[in-house]
Amino acid sequence: MSKKVFWLVVSGLMVISLVMAACAPAATPTTPTPAPATPTTPTAPTTPTTPAQERPQKEAVSPEAPNYGGTLTLAQNTDVTLWDPSRNITGLTMSLIQQELFQGDWAKGPAGGYGTSETDWGAAANDLFDLKTGYLANGWKWTVDEAKGQGTIIFQIRPGVRWALNPKSEASRLVAGREVTADDVVFSLKRGATWELAFIYGFYREFRAVDITKTGPREVTIKVPLDNLVTAVSRFSNAIYIVPPEVVTKYGDMNNWRNAQGTGPFMLADYVPASQIVFARNPNYWDRDPVGPGKGNQLPYLDGVRILILPDASTRLAALRTGKVDQMTGVSMEDSVQLRKNAQALLERIYVSTDGRGTPLAMRLDKPELPFKDIRVRRAMMMAIDFQGIRNSLYGGVGQIVTFPYSSVKEYERLYVGLDDPDFPESARELYSYNPEKAKQLLKEAGYPNGFKTSMVLTSTEVDYYSIIKDMWAK
């Protein structure tokens, strides 16, 4: 039996956070900025099957050119619970190791001041095709057969891309740094669509029986019902990490961190549960810097990345303030005030949740015995929240009360419909009105005149937000 989680109800919540980046004194060498794994050029260098130990050098280096070396230290509030990439759709840990057929085009973001700045990559769910480029696929097309009611997607698999070779990893030695093949892609896409624990299997029932075949030496073809074509293009290209079949065959899955194997810019070197995750540079990474003074350089620039697991908010802030952490997201407005006073060398960026989900609360709609199955309960929970009050008290009047599915950002400007928009449905506008009396009435009609008890699983950064909401619901 499949388990499905639905994002709803308290998904139109306003969120604003800060990205704080540590800035070292001028006399101190700084850690080079990493080049994210988002290539644009189709060039695929031929790489050996054993790691090259020397870092690539350019004959002439201008003062502005990026330098090789250094380790970027980050912090997050939760530990990793799922290492198998098929069970994930996104995430920092996976994106450093594994890759998909499409990913974001780095040159269309800021790119250190050399990109087109069509996006700032703030949207975790950024799914605009115009902002994508080929990673493990370097060619693609899709066609429509209305007579058969069928859509066809064809991917050309990029030549010259090899699996990272970490001599200290048994799983990596098993793959032996071989070239990625069309068979690898077919295996991975089928696994994502048919394995009961895979993310795509759980959320996209319509893909469980699609036809995925190798149709050429480096060609993969997918046939789907025509109604599902657009979603299939997005999900199969940019929501399934490609994995080596032999690792899954030998170990059953890849949920042991020691079996992590990918084509990304880094390799998983070490993991200490509840403490840290350590990544080492993949010396055979296939891609090049696409833009700026480092254009053409082999990526990545960093020697490694270290992620500290720091559940306690005060500990994370202290690590950032003292320079033990180079960058951190999810800083609250209240904490940002103190950081500005006590750590003035920090750089900051304020951003609003750009996919409109804010701080989402997941509820089970496939369980009829739970209150959330009734739409009146879900509407009551929304109407019992004073969104404007939270905006003013918790966020200092800054930020948006976002309306699902997208907030007002330039990437999704055409899709945004605000509360004051004449096209915004009145029934939806009512959800943001803060009407606790109407909420009580709806609960009574749904059979819960005295309310009901439930529990939520939260991260430490969400506690303040939902503590306010909990008090509102209690009334």
PLM regions and their residue ranges:
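Short, well-ordered beta-strand elements
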Residues: 69-78, 151-156, 185-188, 220-222, ...
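Aromatic- and charge-enriched surface segment that lines or borders ligand/interaction sites
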Residues: 130-131, 138-197, 221, 307, ...
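Surface-exposed binding/hinge segments that line
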Residues: 154-156, 178-179, 183-186, 191-248, ...
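Structural transition elements
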Residues: 266, 398-442, 462-465
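Extracellular/periplasmic solute-recognition and catalytic clefts
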Residues: 198-199, 213-214, 269-280, 306-369, ...
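Gly/Pro-rich hinge or "lid" segments in bacterial periplasmic/extracellular proteins
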Residues: 105-110, 114-127, 194-196, 233-306, ...
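N-terminal lobe/hinge region of extracytoplasmic solute-binding protein
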Residues: 73-146, 190, 261
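C-terminal motif of bacterial Sec signal peptides marking the signal peptidase cleavage site
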Residues: 21-22
